[in-house]
Amino acid sequence: MSKGYYSILFSQTTTNLGFSLYTMVVISFLFKMTNSTTIASMVTLISIIFRIFGSAILPLITIRLKLPLTIIISQLIQMLLLICLFYALLRTYSNQTLILVFIIISCISFFNGWFSPLKSAIIGEIISPDRRVKANGLLSTVDQTFQFVGWSLGGLIIAFLGEGYTIILTIFLLFTSLLSLLFCLPHGHANSVIREKNSPNKSIVSGWRYLFSQKKLRTIIIMDLIESWAGMIWIGSVSLAFVNEVLHKGESWWGFINGAYYLGSMIGGFIIYKLSERFQNKLINFMLIGAVSYGSLTLIYGFISNSYLALILVLFMGPAYILRDLTQETLIQNITTEQTRINIMSARSSLVQFIFMFSILAIGAISDFLGVRLVYVSAGILLLVSAIYGFSQLQFKKKVNKHISF
């Protein structure tokens, strides 16, 4: 792997670790300040909305700036905004302070929405197609490991250091991420291709048009959208409700369930990294296997009440999810070109987060009126529908067309 790849790997790790701490700090601070669960929970919704906006306008930036420079600028601005947030946390409570905190959160989320599509586009440009499965597998393994550490130990870190010093730790993590990008990322390579000089409107629309113009890409995106509706099952409030109401366990088991899922994801990413050569030439097959496995396990999980069996199922869900997710990511990187990749990644990120936002809003009603068990059952059905659709479009039609050609 190139030096630029390890720069992205280190940057993603420190950024996501920092933002797991940042999210917990902000939610904890707002809850203590207002004693309102509703206001604290608004952090997630506002973050998603502004990440959508950030991803949507990213093509306007990348027609003028190289991808490495864009990702460096986004990290620098987020670091400066975190410094502003640190000073906001020191202020005494007032409505003005509350508004200021939410403005800073919105701005941070806007620029944070650039990171994922930029990362995927840069990996697609600096890594050759025959090594992308391995590259994405290692990225996922390291990322899941440090997110697990962040979310597991975040509460202890905040309790020990306090909100202010935890934000300082987050700023330090983003600073190290920025240094890695500055000194290791090959600024002259990525985004070196000649791009069409489109108008701002065309630059934004082109990504959305590309999403549905190529058959394989269109199928993967539609699968993505269906799966996004099912993504709400791992929202903290939903998984905690399932543990309490269905498994009849407390918060400790909620931690075990979350830990098992992250552990499974780490194992899945490591397996894909080690066996990348076997996956590389059969991406569609393994994507569909992962989709069917994840959907089936989720559906079964929705019907059970045994906590130990639930733990085992969640442990296996992790590798199934990672298998589906990494093969989808690699397929998109392989299908797209350097001229279109960032526009497609930006449009995809915006669309998936938009659907996910609505699934969050819908999940409360489903859970309250029909019960949290049905949430997981319906999610499992949606995931299987996505897998069946993918099989019908990518495998069945291919076999039919081959048969007709003879």
Curated annotation (Swiss-Prot):
- The source's superkingdom equals Bacteria
Ranges in coiled-coil conformation: none
* Membrane-crossing residue ranges in chain numbering: 7-27, 43-63, 69-89, 98-118, 155-175, 220-240, 253-273, 297-317, 352-372, 374-394
- Membrane topology label: Multi-pass membrane protein
> Which GO MF term does the entry hold, naming one?
efflux transmembrane transporter activity
The protein, known as? Uncharacterized MFS-type transporter YfmI
* Record-linked SUPFAM superfamilies: MFS general substrate transporter
Tell me if Membrane is a UniProt keyword of this record.
Answer: yes
Q: Which UniProt keywords apply?
A: Cell membrane, Membrane, Transmembrane, Transmembrane helix, Transport
Q: Which family does it belong to?
A: Belongs to the major facilitator superfamily.
Give its localization.
Cell membrane
GO BP field: response to antibiotic
Protein species of origin: Bacillus subtilis (strain 168)
